[in-house]
């Protein structure tokens, strides 16, 4: 164990000793000057929990509509409905895309999200899932964030539980963890418009977990949040997971600035630095140690090279191939990569690549 010689933060000592970190500890670590030491401790804990393996899933990202009533300032993807590039896919079109994912790309997971469409009933989502499952029963359908579920419930005048039950009966396997953004109310009110509150997101997720629907969890960082908001957000996720055991991984999502209202209005003028990004990954690992085992590095937003570095700062998962990812593409990010490229990126840093399923069961190792 590291000896406290006055240069090592007490919170790092606690982390090395396996103690659960507090809010105060997290804030201290978000301000820790020695980034290398912070990363080294996070990497040590990552190794204790996950060994040398870095996982990823073969995932096809499918956006069923870009029409959204929310118009969040952080988003470059949404359309109001009268634009030339506004679209809504039919269940049949979605099933056809699922065929491409399975037959041509070897995807084991469909990651399906979209905008808050004001005219789609619950039957649309049920039919979408059934259309996929009738043709490809073995693919995992990970669809509709807690924010979308909450919106659908409000729109269709159903309870959140009823919406979740009907979608599960239609074949829904899991939920993506988007829509969490940042939980701090004041910050959330600036970067989010027309979306559920933090409490509503957490309660929707809790209900999903109670019904046996697992999910990942996320946090959007690198906009106007403060270090203490990052810590508080992560700790709320930690507390929920202690109750439900429903999160498969935590995915810190780096904010992509281009083409957003936050950029146009000058609220955010530049993206976060690599140093800040690595700090968030490392602190996430330390705060969630022994609670949520997996920390995913979302290379689509972070970039492949920085993602490799983040795997030495507490990350143990690269999320997935992200075939046909549209939301970050709208914000100027290059999306989509092959299984071979991901394995090569992992091997370059002397780690062991492994393909997983949605629920973190390893299904293929690469020598």
Task: Name each region found by the language model.
Residues 79-232, 236:
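Conserved Radical SAM active-site core
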Residues 18, 42, 72, 112, ...:
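Conserved, mostly hydrophobic/aromatic
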Residues 1-36, 96, 102-103, 235, ...:
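Auxiliary Fe-S-binding modules of radical SAM enzymes
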Residues 49, 105, 136, 212, ...:
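A structural signal for short coil/turn segments at secondary-structure junctions
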Residues 37-82, 86-113:
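N-terminal pre-triad scaffold of radical SAM enzymes
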Residues 54, 58, 68, 75-78, ...:
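Mobile, glycine- and charge-enriched loop segments
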Residues 26-30, 60-62, 114-118, 221-224, ...:
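Conserved short loop/turn motifs at secondary-structure junctions
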Residues 54-60, 108-110, 141-145, 175-177, ...:
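Hydrophobic faces of well-ordered beta-strands that scaffold small-molecule active sites
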């Amino acid at each position: 164990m590291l000896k406290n010689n006055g240069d090592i933060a007490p919170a790092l000592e606690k982390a090395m000793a396996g103690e659960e970190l507090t809010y105060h500890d997290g804030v201290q670590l978000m301000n820790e000057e020695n980034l290398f030491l912070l990363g080294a401790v996070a990497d040590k804990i990552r190794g204790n929990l996950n060994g040398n393996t870095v996982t990823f899933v073969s995932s096809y990202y499918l956006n069923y509509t870009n029409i959204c009533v929310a118009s969040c300032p952080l988003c470059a993807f949404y359309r109001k409905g009268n634009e030339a590039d506004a679209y809504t896919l039919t269940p049949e079109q979605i099933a056809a895309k699922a065929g491409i994912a399975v037959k041509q790309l070897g995807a084991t997971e469909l990651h399906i999200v979209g905008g808050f469409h004001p005219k789609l009933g619950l039957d649309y989502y049920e039919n979408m899932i059934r259309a996929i499952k009738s043709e490809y029963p073995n693919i995992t359908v990970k669809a509709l964030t807690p924010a979308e579920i909450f919106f659908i419930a409000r729109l269709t005048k159903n309870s959140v539980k009823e919406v979740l039950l009907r979608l599960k009966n239609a074949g829904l396997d899991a939920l993506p963890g988007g829509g969490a953004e940042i939980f701090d109310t004041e910050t959330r009110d600036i970067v989010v418009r027309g979306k559920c509150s933090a409490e509503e997101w957490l309660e929707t997720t809790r209900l999903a977990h109670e019904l046996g629907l697992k999910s990942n969890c996320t946090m959007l960082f690198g906009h106007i949040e403060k270090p203490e908001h990052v810590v508080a957000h992560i700790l709320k996720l930690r507390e929920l997971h202690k109750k439900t055991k429903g999160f498969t991984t935590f995915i810190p999502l780096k904010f992509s600035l281009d083409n957003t209202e936050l950029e146009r209005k000058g609220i955010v003028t530049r993206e976060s630095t690599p140093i800040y990004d690595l700090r968030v990954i490392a602190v996430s690992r330390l705060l969630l140690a022994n609670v949520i085992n997996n920390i995913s590095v979302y290379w689509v937003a972070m970039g492949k090279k920085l993602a490799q570095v983040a795997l030495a700062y507490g990350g143990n998962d690269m999320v997935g191939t992200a075939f046909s990812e549209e939301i970050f593409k709208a914000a100027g990010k290059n999306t989509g990569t092959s299984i071979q490229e991901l394995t090569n990126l992992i091997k370059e840093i002397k780690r062991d690549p492994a393909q997983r399923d949605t629920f973190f069961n390893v299904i293929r190792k690469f020598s």
